[in-house]
A protein has these predicted regions:
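Auxiliary Fe-S-binding modules of radical SAM enzymes
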Residues: 1-92, 244-253, 258-346
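Conserved AdoMet/S-adenosylmethionine-binding subsite of the radical SAM
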Residues: 144-320
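Conserved alpha-helical substructure of the radical SAM core
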Residues: 124-153
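Short linear Ser/Thr-Pro motifs
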Residues: 74-75, 108-109, 122, 192, ...
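Canonical Radical SAM [4Fe-4S] cluster-binding loop centered on the CxxxCxxC motif
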Residues: 98-135
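Generic beta-strand structural signal
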Residues: 80, 92, 103-107, 115, ...
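P-loop NTP-binding catalytic core
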Residues: 88-102
Protein backbone atom coordinates (compact mmCIF):
# COMPACT_ATOMS: atom_id res chain seq x y z
CA UNK A 1 0.00 0.00 0.00
CA UNK A 2 1.35 3.41 -0.98
CA UNK A 3 2.24 5.74 1.89
CA UNK A 4 0.18 8.89 2.21
CA UNK A 5 2.04 12.10 1.42
CA UNK A 6 1.89 15.37 3.35
CA UNK A 7 -0.24 17.80 1.34
CA UNK A 8 0.94 20.63 3.63
CA UNK A 9 4.44 20.19 2.17
CA UNK A 10 3.42 20.93 -1.42
CA UNK A 11 3.99 24.41 -2.78
CA UNK A 12 1.10 26.02 -4.63
CA UNK A 13 2.81 25.17 -7.92
CA UNK A 14 3.26 21.52 -6.90
CA UNK A 15 -0.33 21.31 -5.65
CA UNK A 16 -1.58 22.72 -8.95
CA UNK A 17 0.35 20.02 -10.84
CA UNK A 18 -1.03 17.26 -8.58
CA UNK A 19 -4.62 18.38 -9.11
CA UNK A 20 -4.12 18.73 -12.84
CA UNK A 21 -3.10 15.05 -12.89
CA UNK A 22 -6.38 14.32 -11.10
CA UNK A 23 -8.25 16.16 -13.85
CA UNK A 24 -9.20 19.05 -11.58
CA UNK A 25 -9.43 22.72 -12.66
CA UNK A 26 -6.56 25.01 -11.71
CA UNK A 27 -8.53 27.09 -9.21
CA UNK A 28 -8.96 24.06 -6.94
CA UNK A 29 -5.28 24.20 -5.98
CA UNK A 30 -5.55 27.73 -4.63
CA UNK A 31 -8.70 26.80 -2.72
CA UNK A 32 -7.00 23.81 -1.11
CA UNK A 33 -3.89 25.86 -0.34
CA UNK A 34 -6.11 28.41 1.43
CA UNK A 35 -7.73 25.69 3.53
CA UNK A 36 -4.39 24.28 4.67
CA UNK A 37 -2.20 27.39 4.94
CA UNK A 38 -4.67 30.20 5.65
CA UNK A 39 -7.67 28.65 7.37
CA UNK A 40 -5.37 26.08 9.03
CA UNK A 41 -7.74 23.12 8.83
CA UNK A 42 -6.35 19.69 9.64
CA UNK A 43 -9.15 17.55 8.22
CA UNK A 44 -10.20 17.30 4.58
CA UNK A 45 -13.85 17.05 5.62
CA UNK A 46 -13.67 20.69 6.80
CA UNK A 47 -13.11 21.87 3.21
CA UNK A 48 -16.77 22.63 2.60
CA UNK A 49 -16.44 24.13 -0.89
CA UNK A 50 -14.74 21.06 -2.38
CA UNK A 51 -16.47 18.18 -4.21
CA UNK A 52 -16.91 15.10 -2.04
CA UNK A 53 -15.36 12.89 -4.71
CA UNK A 54 -12.20 15.03 -4.73
CA UNK A 55 -11.99 15.05 -0.94
CA UNK A 56 -12.25 11.25 -0.92
CA UNK A 57 -9.35 11.00 -3.39
CA UNK A 58 -7.28 13.47 -1.38
CA UNK A 59 -7.99 11.52 1.81
CA UNK A 60 -6.68 8.35 0.16
CA UNK A 61 -3.46 9.93 -1.10
CA UNK A 62 -2.57 12.67 1.40
CA UNK A 63 -2.63 13.75 5.02
CA UNK A 64 -2.48 17.22 6.57
CA UNK A 65 0.35 17.73 9.07
CA UNK A 66 -1.25 18.10 12.51
CA UNK A 67 1.09 17.43 15.44
CA UNK A 68 -0.26 16.62 18.88
CA UNK A 69 0.72 18.87 21.79
CA UNK A 70 2.34 16.28 24.03
CA UNK A 71 3.47 18.80 26.63
CA UNK A 72 3.00 22.54 27.08
CA UNK A 73 4.92 24.82 29.43
CA UNK A 74 4.02 28.49 29.87
CA UNK A 75 6.14 31.08 31.65
CA UNK A 76 4.95 34.18 33.49
CA UNK A 77 6.05 36.41 30.61
CA UNK A 78 3.87 34.48 28.14
CA UNK A 79 6.61 32.37 26.58
CA UNK A 80 5.21 28.95 25.66
CA UNK A 81 7.28 25.85 24.99
CA UNK A 82 5.71 22.85 23.27
CA UNK A 83 6.75 19.25 22.93
CA UNK A 84 4.98 18.24 19.71
CA UNK A 85 4.43 14.64 18.63
CA UNK A 86 4.48 14.16 14.88
CA UNK A 87 2.44 11.60 12.91
CA UNK A 88 5.22 8.98 13.10
CA UNK A 89 5.55 9.33 16.88
CA UNK A 90 8.73 11.39 16.88
CA UNK A 91 8.81 14.50 19.08
CA UNK A 92 10.17 17.98 18.41
CA UNK A 93 10.17 21.29 20.27
CA UNK A 94 8.56 24.60 19.31
CA UNK A 95 8.60 27.85 21.30
CA UNK A 96 6.40 30.96 21.17
CA UNK A 97 8.09 34.16 22.36
CA UNK A 98 6.15 37.36 22.92
CA UNK A 99 7.66 40.74 22.09
CA UNK A 100 6.25 44.27 21.82
CA UNK A 101 6.26 43.95 18.02
CA UNK A 102 4.42 40.62 17.85
CA UNK A 103 4.65 36.88 18.45
CA UNK A 104 7.72 34.97 17.32
CA UNK A 105 7.85 31.20 16.88
CA UNK A 106 11.12 29.29 17.11
CA UNK A 107 10.74 26.19 14.93
CA UNK A 108 12.60 22.90 14.69
CA UNK A 109 13.67 21.72 11.23
CA UNK A 110 14.84 18.18 12.06
CA UNK A 111 14.07 15.43 14.54
CA UNK A 112 17.37 15.59 16.37
CA UNK A 113 20.57 16.96 14.86
CA UNK A 114 23.83 15.49 13.59
CA UNK A 115 26.04 18.59 13.93
CA UNK A 116 27.41 17.48 17.30
CA UNK A 117 27.81 20.89 18.99
CA UNK A 118 29.07 20.01 22.46
CA UNK A 119 26.99 22.55 24.38
CA UNK A 120 23.65 21.60 22.78
CA UNK A 121 21.09 19.06 24.01
CA UNK A 122 19.47 18.77 20.56
CA UNK A 123 22.34 16.85 19.06
CA UNK A 124 23.16 14.36 21.80
CA UNK A 125 21.06 11.53 20.35
CA UNK A 126 21.93 12.40 16.75
CA UNK A 127 19.53 13.05 13.89
CA UNK A 128 16.53 10.77 13.39
CA UNK A 129 15.15 12.37 10.23
CA UNK A 130 14.45 15.64 8.47
CA UNK A 131 11.12 17.37 8.96
CA UNK A 132 9.03 17.94 5.86
CA UNK A 133 8.07 21.47 4.83
CA UNK A 134 4.48 20.92 5.93
CA UNK A 135 5.56 19.63 9.33
CA UNK A 136 7.58 22.80 9.91
CA UNK A 137 4.57 24.88 8.83
CA UNK A 138 2.41 22.88 11.24
CA UNK A 139 4.56 23.99 14.19
CA UNK A 140 3.52 27.57 13.48
CA UNK A 141 -0.11 26.73 12.80
CA UNK A 142 -0.38 24.65 15.98
CA UNK A 143 1.12 27.45 18.07
CA UNK A 144 -1.05 30.13 16.46
CA UNK A 145 -4.23 28.17 17.11
CA UNK A 146 -3.15 27.39 20.67
CA UNK A 147 -2.44 30.98 21.72
CA UNK A 148 -5.27 32.44 19.63
CA UNK A 149 -3.05 35.19 18.25
CA UNK A 150 -1.28 35.77 14.94
CA UNK A 151 2.33 34.69 14.58
CA UNK A 152 4.24 37.54 12.92
CA UNK A 153 7.88 36.42 13.09
CA UNK A 154 9.78 33.13 12.72
CA UNK A 155 13.24 32.04 13.80
CA UNK A 156 14.61 28.75 12.49
CA UNK A 157 16.66 28.15 15.62
CA UNK A 158 15.02 25.10 17.18
CA UNK A 159 16.14 21.47 16.97
CA UNK A 160 18.16 20.71 13.85
CA UNK A 161 20.42 22.51 11.37
CA UNK A 162 18.13 24.20 8.80
CA UNK A 163 20.69 24.08 5.98
CA UNK A 164 21.15 20.34 6.55
CA UNK A 165 17.50 20.04 5.45
CA UNK A 166 17.85 22.54 2.63
CA UNK A 167 15.14 21.53 0.15
CA UNK A 168 12.37 21.10 2.72
CA UNK A 169 13.30 24.35 4.44
CA UNK A 170 13.14 26.20 1.11
CA UNK A 171 9.65 24.77 0.48
CA UNK A 172 8.63 25.74 4.00
CA UNK A 173 9.81 29.32 3.41
CA UNK A 174 7.89 29.49 0.13
CA UNK A 175 4.67 28.26 1.74
CA UNK A 176 4.86 30.26 4.96
CA UNK A 177 5.56 33.53 3.13
CA UNK A 178 2.95 32.97 0.42
CA UNK A 179 0.25 35.67 0.16
CA UNK A 180 -2.15 32.72 -0.31
CA UNK A 181 -1.22 31.43 3.17
CA UNK A 182 -0.40 33.07 6.51
CA UNK A 183 1.84 35.47 4.58
CA UNK A 184 4.72 35.96 7.02
CA UNK A 185 7.17 38.22 5.21
CA UNK A 186 10.73 37.06 4.59
CA UNK A 187 12.09 40.10 6.43
CA UNK A 188 10.37 38.74 9.54
CA UNK A 189 12.20 35.41 9.27
CA UNK A 190 15.65 34.54 10.64
CA UNK A 191 17.48 31.37 9.65
CA UNK A 192 20.30 30.10 11.84
CA UNK A 193 23.20 27.93 10.67
CA UNK A 194 26.23 26.45 12.38
CA UNK A 195 28.20 27.10 9.20
CA UNK A 196 27.59 24.65 6.33
CA UNK A 197 29.54 26.70 3.78
CA UNK A 198 28.28 25.09 0.52
CA UNK A 199 24.70 25.53 1.72
CA UNK A 200 25.31 29.17 2.68
CA UNK A 201 26.45 29.75 -0.90
CA UNK A 202 23.39 27.90 -2.19
CA UNK A 203 21.13 30.01 0.03
CA UNK A 204 22.82 33.19 -1.20
CA UNK A 205 21.85 32.24 -4.74
CA UNK A 206 18.17 32.30 -3.72
CA UNK A 207 18.50 36.00 -2.77
CA UNK A 208 15.84 35.70 -0.11
CA UNK A 209 15.13 38.72 2.07
CA UNK A 210 15.44 36.78 5.33
CA UNK A 211 18.10 37.37 7.99
CA UNK A 212 20.94 34.85 8.12
CA UNK A 213 22.11 34.21 11.66
CA UNK A 214 25.48 32.47 11.96
CA UNK A 215 26.13 30.38 15.06
CA UNK A 216 29.77 31.38 15.50
CA UNK A 217 30.31 30.90 19.26
CA UNK A 218 34.11 31.30 19.06
CA UNK A 219 36.53 33.70 17.34
CA UNK A 220 39.24 31.19 16.42
CA UNK A 221 39.64 27.63 15.21
CA UNK A 222 41.15 26.22 18.40
CA UNK A 223 38.16 27.13 20.53
CA UNK A 224 35.50 26.64 17.85
CA UNK A 225 36.68 23.15 16.86
CA UNK A 226 36.52 22.16 20.53
CA UNK A 227 32.91 23.34 20.74
CA UNK A 228 31.64 22.58 17.22
CA UNK A 229 32.84 19.64 15.09
CA UNK A 230 31.56 21.41 11.94
CA UNK A 231 34.54 23.75 12.28
CA UNK A 232 36.88 20.93 11.25
CA UNK A 233 35.19 20.86 7.85
CA UNK A 234 34.61 24.61 7.53
CA UNK A 235 37.09 26.55 9.68
CA UNK A 236 36.45 30.11 10.81
CA UNK A 237 38.26 31.81 7.92
CA UNK A 238 36.37 29.71 5.32
CA UNK A 239 33.06 30.38 7.06
CA UNK A 240 33.68 34.12 7.20
CA UNK A 241 34.51 34.20 3.50
CA UNK A 242 31.16 32.51 2.80
CA UNK A 243 29.34 35.00 5.02
CA UNK A 244 30.91 37.91 3.16
CA UNK A 245 29.93 36.33 -0.16
CA UNK A 246 26.40 35.98 1.17
CA UNK A 247 26.29 39.67 2.07
CA UNK A 248 27.63 40.72 -1.32
CA UNK A 249 25.16 38.51 -3.19
CA UNK A 250 22.03 39.31 -1.20
CA UNK A 251 22.70 42.81 0.11
CA UNK A 252 21.41 41.59 3.48
CA UNK A 253 23.10 42.04 6.82
CA UNK A 254 23.89 38.99 8.90
CA UNK A 255 23.90 38.46 12.64
CA UNK A 256 26.18 36.26 14.71
CA UNK A 257 25.13 34.10 17.64
CA UNK A 258 27.73 33.78 20.38
CA UNK A 259 26.96 31.43 23.27
CA UNK A 260 28.92 32.52 26.33
CA UNK A 261 30.74 29.63 28.02
CA UNK A 262 32.58 30.26 31.27
CA UNK A 263 36.34 30.10 30.90
CA UNK A 264 36.16 28.98 27.27
CA UNK A 265 35.19 31.86 24.97
CA UNK A 266 34.47 34.77 27.31
CA UNK A 267 37.88 36.43 27.77
CA UNK A 268 38.87 39.95 26.69
CA UNK A 269 41.22 38.31 24.18
CA UNK A 270 38.25 36.47 22.65
CA UNK A 271 36.29 39.72 22.46
CA UNK A 272 39.15 41.40 20.60
CA UNK A 273 39.53 38.47 18.18
CA UNK A 274 35.77 38.49 17.56
CA UNK A 275 35.78 42.23 16.89
CA UNK A 276 38.72 41.87 14.49
CA UNK A 277 36.85 39.09 12.69
CA UNK A 278 33.61 40.93 11.97
CA UNK A 279 34.40 44.64 12.19
CA UNK A 280 33.23 46.55 9.12
CA UNK A 281 30.56 44.01 8.15
CA UNK A 282 27.71 45.95 9.74
CA UNK A 283 26.86 42.75 11.57
CA UNK A 284 25.16 42.36 14.92
CA UNK A 285 26.30 39.98 17.67
CA UNK A 286 23.81 38.26 19.98
CA UNK A 287 25.47 37.20 23.22
CA UNK A 288 23.73 34.18 24.76
CA UNK A 289 24.50 32.79 28.23
CA UNK A 290 24.24 29.04 27.59
CA UNK A 291 21.65 26.89 29.29
CA UNK A 292 23.04 23.97 31.30
CA UNK A 293 22.87 20.64 29.48
CA UNK A 294 23.04 17.26 31.21
CA UNK A 295 26.32 15.57 30.38
CA UNK A 296 28.01 18.74 29.12
CA UNK A 297 31.14 20.09 30.84
CA UNK A 298 30.18 23.66 29.97
CA UNK A 299 28.62 26.26 32.26
CA UNK A 300 27.31 29.74 31.52
CA UNK A 301 29.32 32.91 31.88
CA UNK A 302 27.90 34.96 34.76
CA UNK A 303 25.93 38.12 34.01
CA UNK A 304 28.70 40.54 35.02
CA UNK A 305 31.19 38.95 32.65
CA UNK A 306 28.66 38.80 29.82
CA UNK A 307 28.14 42.56 30.28
CA UNK A 308 31.92 43.13 30.35
CA UNK A 309 32.32 41.15 27.12
CA UNK A 310 29.55 43.18 25.48
CA UNK A 311 31.14 46.47 26.53
CA UNK A 312 34.51 45.33 25.20
CA UNK A 313 32.97 44.51 21.81
CA UNK A 314 31.19 47.85 21.64
CA UNK A 315 34.38 49.71 22.55
CA UNK A 316 35.96 47.96 19.54
CA UNK A 317 33.19 49.08 17.18
CA UNK A 318 30.95 46.00 17.17
CA UNK A 319 27.22 46.20 17.87
CA UNK A 320 26.34 43.57 20.48
CA UNK A 321 23.34 42.82 22.67
CA UNK A 322 22.69 40.26 25.37
CA UNK A 323 19.77 38.08 24.36
CA UNK A 324 16.78 38.61 26.59
CA UNK A 325 16.10 35.42 28.50
CA UNK A 326 12.41 34.79 27.95
CA UNK A 327 10.52 32.37 30.13
CA UNK A 328 13.41 31.79 32.50
CA UNK A 329 11.50 29.23 34.55
CA UNK A 330 10.99 27.01 31.46
CA UNK A 331 14.21 27.86 29.65
CA UNK A 332 15.59 24.34 29.62
CA UNK A 333 18.20 24.02 26.90
CA UNK A 334 16.91 23.58 23.36
CA UNK A 335 16.28 19.88 22.92
CA UNK A 336 16.19 19.10 26.65
CA UNK A 337 12.42 18.56 26.75
CA UNK A 338 12.62 16.11 23.84
CA UNK A 339 15.58 14.37 25.44
CA UNK A 340 13.70 14.02 28.74
CA UNK A 341 10.75 12.52 26.85
CA UNK A 342 13.07 10.02 25.13
CA UNK A 343 14.56 9.09 28.51
CA UNK A 344 11.15 8.69 30.13
CA UNK A 345 11.44 11.76 32.36
CA UNK A 346 8.41 13.57 30.94
Amino acid sequence: MEMKRCISSLTLEQLTAELKEMGQPGFRAKQLFHWVHQKLVTDFSAMTDQPKALLARLEEAFYIAAPIIERRQEAKDGTVKYLLRMADGNCIETVVMRYHYGNTVCVSTQVGCRMGCRFCASTQAGRVRNLEAGEICSEIYTAQKDIGERISHIVLMGIGEPLDNFDEVMRFLENISSPEGVNIGMRNISLSTCGLVPKIDQLAGKKLQLTLSVSLHAPNNDIRSGMMPVNDAYPVEVLMQAVRRYQETTGRRVSFEYSMVRGVNDSDACAKQLADLIRGMGAHVNLIPINPVDGSPYSATDAANVRRFQQKLESLGVNATVRRRLGSEISAACGQLRRDEMNGKV
